[in-house]
Each structure stands twice: as structure tokens, then as C-alpha cells.
Amino acid sequence: MNLNQEVIKKVIDYIEKHLDEEMELDNIARHAGYSKFHLNRIFTEETGTTIHKYLQLRRLTIAAEKLAKTDIPVAQIAYEAGYHSQLAFSLAIKKINLYQPKLYRNMGIFAPKQNRMEMAA
């Protein structure tokens, strides 16, 4: 594993540990010891996606699983996923799953869009 991969692993571990918290790229970069621009560049080079997109898709994947497998109210799931409005959450879920949250829930099928990334050793 090269240095960039070690840094990305550290970043992914940090993101996964704090998925349910407010996260700013500045804080993630500070944790990794890099500028946000450099960190985002190497993250994108190593993973093929930006930190923001990874974080967003991980949160939406967890939210989709909650929709499919629990009776937690949609508004609560939206809030837990970092959305301040149910409308914004509904649009984001529909964009990745093609269905509004209530319809997705009624289907009862969970199809993960972004699993946790693992860096090869």
C-alpha cells in the first residue's frame, strides 16, 4: 500500500466513523494532515470519486437501507442522512434509486449504491 492509499484508508475510516455527524472537507483534511485541495485530488485519483460524492452516496445508501428495512419516519431518516429538508432528501434518493422514498420503502428491496471502500493492500 503506497502513502496515498494509506491516507485514503485513514480518510475512509474517519468518514465511516462519523457518517452521522456534520462533516466539512476542512475537518477531514485537517484529520488527514493535508490541504483540502490536495486531499480531494488524491482521493479522487485513488477512488475515482470526490470525498463529497463518496460521503453523500454512503449516507444515501444507509438511508435507503433504513427505508427498505425499517419503519423509521422518512423525515427522521432524512435528518440522520444530513438533509435539512425532506424535499431535498427525496430528490437525492430519487436521483440514485429512481423512486421517491415512500415508494422505495413499499418496494422493500435494498440495492446499495455505495458500499464502504476498501484500499487494496
Task: Tell where the protein language model's regions lie, with residue ranges.
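…primarily DNA-binding HTH/wHTH and HhH modules…
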Residues: M1-N4, L91-A121
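Terminal helix-turn-helix DNA-binding modules in bacterial transcription factors
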Residues: K9-D26, E45-A81, M107-A121
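Basic/polar phosphate-binding segments, predominantly the helix-turn-helix DNA-binding elements
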Residues: E22-L55, A78-Q100
